[in-house]
Amino acid sequence: MRKSISIAFVIAITIFMSHLNVFTVYSLTPCEEATNLLTPCLRYLWAPPEAKPSPECCSGLDKVNKGVKTYDDRHDMCICLSSEAAITSADQYKFDNLPKLCNVALFAPVGPKFDCSTIKV
């Protein structure tokens, strides 16, 4: 008797919770993930010319770079990063130097002026 009440209670709670969408998992798009990973780079991009990127910035850049495997990934991420770069209104020189300063061989140049259609297959 007690066991059947416990099972009924668990079923009732499960049904109730499913109606509340408590178990819904929201995932980020690759662009949103990259934007989150590169947020620490904003301090460098807006800093004086002699500034260096933080370890968190470089780590984020490396993770984004390692996450793009295919041509479509590279092209989509290029569009994402170029759009985000245009919003930051930082100096193109800073974008150009970021991969070098972080020692990351980036899949494509980053910055608001880069033409993503020139990425090679």
From Swiss-Prot:
Keyword vocabulary terms for this entry: Disulfide bond, Lipid-binding, Signal, Transport
Name of the coding gene: LTP9
InterPro entries membership: Bifun_inhib/LTP/seed_sf, Bifunc_inhib/LTP/seed_store, Plant_nsLTP
SUPFAM superfamilies: Bifunctional inhibitor/lipid-transfer protein/seed storage 2S albumin
Cited function: Plant non-specific lipid-transfer proteins transfer phospholipids as well as galactolipids across membranes. May play a role in wax or cutin deposition in the cell walls of expanding epidermal cells and certain secretory tissues.
An MF annotation (GO) of this entry: lipid binding
Entry keyword Acetylation: no
Protein name: Non-specific lipid-transfer protein 9
Similarity comment: family membership: Belongs to the plant LTP family.
SMART domains in the cross-refs: AAI
Disulfide bonds: C31-C80, C41-C57, C58-C102, C78-C116
Gene Ontology terms describing biological process: lipid transport
Pfam families linked to this entry: Tryp_alpha_amyl
Signal peptide: 1-27
Source organism, top-level taxon: Eukaryota
